[in-house]
């Protein structure tokens, strides 16, 4: 059971981190004031393997309609993905990914909706940025130098995901032996240095809680890890950049109420000072964040 005493002890040990401020910048034409107003990233999946059925769109027209609906419901950015991160999902080649992504990216760009593309492929990255994507959601670091050069050339933002492996589809066991934050801080510090050296100015950091490590298949182990990282995320803000989190679903616990899972985890992520919430449930997360803002400013 999570207690007030545990939260007080956590903040007491890391008071400087709790007061840290992060970089604020524009994505597309939209200014993001992360230190005062957390933002929402709505998900549109272009892969039939994605299990969250409400977010799956198998045609460009349906994807554009869903993206515009999410923007109207409160999404600040739309995140597109053409390959599922599920461990048993089929691999999707670069050509197939770009054929699915580009019509949607172009349509949303024309509608002035900031677009993110989730990928670890340099070829998909190049095509997406040239088509008008404003954010690259980088789920692998094997080709990070090339990706950072492309991001900088387009004055785009990059979400650097923590991955223990070449990319999200090639992960093994997660190191659960100790506090994960120092390990993540070291990883992000190296990636930030590399990104900045190649000209990237707009950076967000994602601890990668939605990735399918082999030793996190047990539901209780996975949820305990996710909650611990959510609550400790504010410690990563000392690196100077906003924190992005993909909200989990915890189907084994929520079962037929699975659409309530992301709002539950959003509260914990907000307590850890998350700056960008990646979600399939935009209106529910918007309601949670607006309510927490009222409490914060009361």
Features from the language model and the residues they span:
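N-terminal amphipathic alpha-helix/helix-capping segment at the start of soluble metabolic enzymes
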Residues: 1-48, 196, 290, 296-298
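Active-site loop-to-helix "anion-binding N-cap" substructures in soluble metabolic enzymes
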Residues: 25, 70, 77, 119, ...
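Structural preference for beta-strand elements that scaffold enzyme active sites
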Residues: 39-43, 76-79, 114-116, 134-135, ...
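A generic "binding-loop/recognition-motif" signal
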Residues: 47, 120-121
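Glycine/serine-rich anion-binding loops at beta->alpha junctions
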Residues: 48-57, 73-84, 203, 209
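A short, N-terminal amphipathic alpha-helix
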Residues: 65-77, 81, 107-108
